[in-house]
C-alpha cells in the first residue's frame, strides 16, 4: 500500500519537475521495519507470553545497520538528516521560490529525501486525511465565523482565485467548515501566502487577507500555535500480566480496541484531527484552547472502558485500575 501511495505521488511530481526517483523509491522501501517473534504455546500461557515478550525485547535492542543502496555525494534531508536529498541542486539555482514550492512543495532552504517528498505530496484517499497544523492553529478564528461572514469568505477566496492561486491550494481539507468550506486555515496566515504569490500579486493577496480579517474578526490574526496530544495507558503491562488465559487476554485486547474506536469522534468533537489511535496509544492535533478538555474526556473514557480489569496491587488490599496519561505539547 505504501508503494501505491508513493508511486502516485512521485508520478505527479515527475510530470512537472526532475528528481532522483530511483533513490526516492529505495528510501521509501527502507522506511518501514517489522519485528516478530514466536515461541511454542504450551499449557502455561503466562509463561509462554513472558517468553515471547523477552524475545521481542531482545530483538528490538539488536541493532543491525545494512549499507544504504542510495548513498551519494549529495545534501542530506533538512527535515531529519537521515537520508540524502532527491531534489537536484540545479533546481534551487534555476527556480524561483514560488516555482520551488509549486513543483516540489519545498522552501529554498529545505532539502527533501524520498520520504520527505512523499510526506509533502502523498495522498491516501478521501476521508483518510487529517488537518494541516496551520488549519488547527487557525481553528479558534474559524470557530468565530458564522453565516453572516459567508459573503466575506467568498470575496476573499474569489480574490485569491483571480490572482491565480493554484487549484490544489484550495478545497484541500478533508472535512468542510460550515462557512470557510474545504479551504485550509493556512490561508488566514499572511506569511503562508508567500507560498502561492510573489511581488505585486503577493501584496494584493495580503491586502485582501487584511480586509477579510478586519471585516470578520475586527483585525484579530490567528496565533501560530497548536497542540500535539499524546496519550498512553498506565499499568498496561501489569494488567496484561494479570490475564492468566488466552480468553482473558483477548477480552482485554477487545476492550482496548473498543476504546480506540471511540477516540476519533471525541477528537473531532473538540475540532481536532486524529493521527493515530491503537489500543491505549493516541496521537492527535488539537486547537490549543480545546486540548485540555479533550485530554480529560479521553482519560475518563479510557477509565470507564477499562474498569473491569482492575487488579490487586502490591499491598494486596488496593485495587489498581488502568488509567490514561495524556501529554500536551504546544
What does each model-identified segment do?
Residues 1-278, 282-330:
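Regulatory/sensor and coupling segments of signal-transduction and defense proteins
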Amino acid at each position: 500500500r505504501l508503494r501505491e501511495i508513493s508511486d502516485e505521488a512521485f508520478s505527479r511530481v515527475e510530470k512537472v519537475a526532475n528528481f532522483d526517483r530511483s533513490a526516492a523509491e529505495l528510501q521509501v522501501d527502507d522506511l518501514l521495519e517489522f519485528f516478530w517473534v514466536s515461541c511454542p504455546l504450551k499449557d502455561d500461557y503466562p509463561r509462554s507470553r513472558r517468553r515471547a515478550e523477552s524475545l521481542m525485547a531482545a530483538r528490538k535492542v539488536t541493532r543491525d545497520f545494512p549499507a544504504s543502496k542510495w548513498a551519494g555525494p549529495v545534501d542530506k534531508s533538512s527535515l531529519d538528516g537521515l537520508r540524502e536529498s532527491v531534489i537536484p541542486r540545479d533546481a534551487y539555482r534555476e527556480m524561483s521560490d514560488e516555482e520551488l514550492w509549486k513543483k516540489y512543495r519545498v522552501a529554498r532552504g529545505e532539502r527533501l529525501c524520498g520520504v520527505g517528498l512523499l510526506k509533502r505530496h502523498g495522498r491516501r484517499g478521501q476521508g483518510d486525511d487529517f488537518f494541516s497544523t496551520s488549519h488547527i492553529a487557525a481553528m479558534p478564528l474559524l470557530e468565530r465565523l458564522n453565516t453572516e461572514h459567508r459573503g466575506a469568505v467568498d470575496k476573499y477566496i474569489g480574490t485569491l482565485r483571480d490572482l491565480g492561486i493554484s487549484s490544489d491550494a484550495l478545497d484541500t481539507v478533508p472535512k468542510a467548515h460550515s462557512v470557510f468550506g474545504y479551504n485550509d486555515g493556512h490561508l488566514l496566515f499572511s506569511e503562508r501566502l508567500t507560498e502561492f504569490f510573489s511581488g505585486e500579486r503577493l501584496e494584493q493577496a495580503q491586502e485582501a487577507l487584511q480586509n477579510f480579517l478586519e471585516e470578520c474578526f475586527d483585525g484579530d490574526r490567528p496565533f501560530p500555535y497548536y497542540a500535539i496530544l499524546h496519550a498512553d495507558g498506565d499499568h498496561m503491562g501489569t494488567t496484561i500480566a494479570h490475564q492468566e488465559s488466552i480468553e482473558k487476554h483477548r477480552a482485554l485486547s477487545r476492550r482496548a480496541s473498543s476504546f480506540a474506536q471511540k477516540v476519533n469522534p471525541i477528537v473531532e468533537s473538540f475540532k481536532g484531527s486524529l493521527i493515530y489511535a491503537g489500543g491505549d496509544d493516541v496521537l492527535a492535533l488539537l486547537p490549543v484552547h480545546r486540548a485540555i478538555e479533550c485530554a480529560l474526556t479521553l482519560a475518563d473514557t479510557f477509565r470507564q472502558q477499562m474498569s473491569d480489569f482492575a487488579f490487586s496491587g502490591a499491598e494486596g488490599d488496593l485495587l489498581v485500575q488502568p488509567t490514561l496519561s495524556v501529554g500536551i505539547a504546544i
